[in-house]
């Protein structure tokens, strides 16, 4: 008779991991099957030695609610497992996740190389906010690998990209960009918000740090703000020689070397111990609980999002009032077709843009005539959403930056939800009739 394979030795698939990681057995105190919400600000130490061990990182338990929480811990373990990372840190927003990631890599006098086709808020952070702190950025055409490599300097600390460009969902070559970054001994940072780990796991293609706005597909219902940073555990910070704040004794934390003390969790541990301690963009236990609920249905929702989106893309691509649809499934460039096939074999990009025939006013009139779609500044909700990027999400960009990101006055961004596809297409159809 064959020997039973114990649970701890089994290799579970994504749909199982999204339900069980971090709580492999019921809550030890209450036997609750659902992860409890630990609504507490602080934790009792057994004695002074126990407290000292916690503060000295010799004991990895809870200290204070700004830094850790048991509900948050389950969420972090689960998203790390889904992304294939070694550790994760959940924070108060996607913007906080991105800011902490850059601040943990770069200091005054340092430099970042970033893709031009990224979220407008991230562009503002890199172009306008961080230079005041001495951190500068060169924005590059991420599809021109020579341009990317030529932008890297001696003081460059990371290459920053998004799996799917915002807002046009163009697919980037993660693997090629990772090779360039690693050649120069710097990490590749990938915002995987639009793709989710269900469709692509950037770490498998060489990414070193993955960030998310958990507000989007992870939460999935437009109720909660949050962000996540996932560390691959594979980047050799010490061999790089460029990240002394991680590898050398840290004066603000009694001389600890995070790489020596925390190994493959060094990057997120330093953010938790230093940046989160000092600036406090803490996720709440309730938000962590809601995101855990979102993760439990992530694969189911994303499958429906993708299924609906592909049908809407085809509908728009065939519509006489549409100038062009920007989605990798209908890309005319051979390179985009190949990248889409490589990274998104199950489809992807339920957030995309199209240009309506006409001017900015025609685009706005079309949006105003939609009734099922909600006009709001979010994406990846189960409800279908729409917005006019040039006057909203990317309104702080210059004309040149808008063109770099493929945004025109007649560009409309859609986020396709999980409603019945016939109802989605009917709503689009009625809006087209109203503006023809």
Give the residues covered by each predicted segment.
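Short, acidic Gly/Pro/Ser/Thr-rich loop/turn segments
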Residues: 26, 44-48, 236-237, 298, ...
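Short amphipathic alpha-helical segments
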Residues: 60, 86, 287, 291, ...
């Amino acid at each position: 008779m064959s020997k039973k394979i114990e649970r701890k030795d089994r290799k579970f698939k994504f749909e199982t991991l999204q339900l069980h990681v971090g709580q492999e057995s019921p809550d030890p105190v209450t036997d609750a099957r659902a992860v409890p919400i630990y609504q507490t600000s602080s934790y009792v130490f057994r004695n002074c030695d126990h407290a000292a061990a916690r503060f000295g990182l010799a004991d990895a338990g809870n200290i204070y609610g700004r830094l850790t929480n048991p509900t948050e811990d389950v969420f972090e373990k689960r998203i790390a497992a889904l992304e294939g990372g070694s550790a994760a840190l959940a924070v108060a927003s996607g913007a906080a996740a991105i800011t902490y990631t850059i601040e943990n890599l770069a200091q005054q006098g340092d430099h970042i190389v970033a893709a031009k086709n990224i979220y407008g808020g991230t562009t503002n952070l890199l172009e306008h906010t961080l230079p005041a702190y001495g951190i500068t950025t060169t924005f590059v055409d991420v599809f021109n690998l020579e341009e990317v490599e030529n932008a890297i300097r001696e003081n460059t600390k990371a290459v920053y990209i998004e799996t799917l460009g915002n807002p046009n969902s163009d697919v980037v070559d993660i693997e090629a960009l990772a090779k360039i970054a690693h050649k120069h001994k710097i990490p590749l940072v990938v915002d995987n918000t639009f793709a989710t780990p269900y469709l692509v796991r950037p770490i498998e293609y060489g990414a070193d740090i993955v960030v998310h706005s958990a507000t989007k597909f992870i939460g999935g219902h437009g109720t909660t703000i949050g962000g996540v940073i996932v560390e691959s555990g594979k980047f050799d910070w010490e061999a790089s020689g460029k990240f002394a704040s991680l590898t050398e004794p840290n004066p603000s934390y009694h001389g600890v070397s995070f790489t020596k003390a925390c190994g493959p969790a060094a990057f997120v541990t330093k953010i938790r111990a230093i940046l989160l301690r000092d600036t406090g963009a803490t996720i709440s236990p309730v938000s962590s609980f809601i995101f855990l609920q979102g993760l439990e249905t992530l694969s189911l929702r994303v499958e429906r999002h993708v299924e609906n989106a592909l049908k809407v893309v085809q509908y728009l691509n065939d519509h006489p009032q549409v100038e062009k649809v920007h989605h990798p499934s209908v890309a005319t460039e051979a390179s985009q077709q190949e990248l889409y096939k490589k990274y998104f074999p199950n489809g992807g990009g339920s957030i995309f843009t199209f240009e309506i025939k006409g001017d900015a006013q025609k685009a706005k009139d079309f949006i105003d005539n939609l009734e099922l779609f909600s006009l709001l500044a979010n994406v990846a909700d189960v409800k279908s959403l729409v917005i006019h990027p040039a006057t909203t999400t990317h309104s702080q960009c210059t004309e040149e930056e808008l063109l770099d990101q493929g945004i025109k006055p007649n560009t409309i961004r859609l986020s396709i939800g999980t409603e019945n596809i016939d109802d989605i297409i009917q709503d689009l159809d009625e809006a087209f009739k109203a503006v023809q």
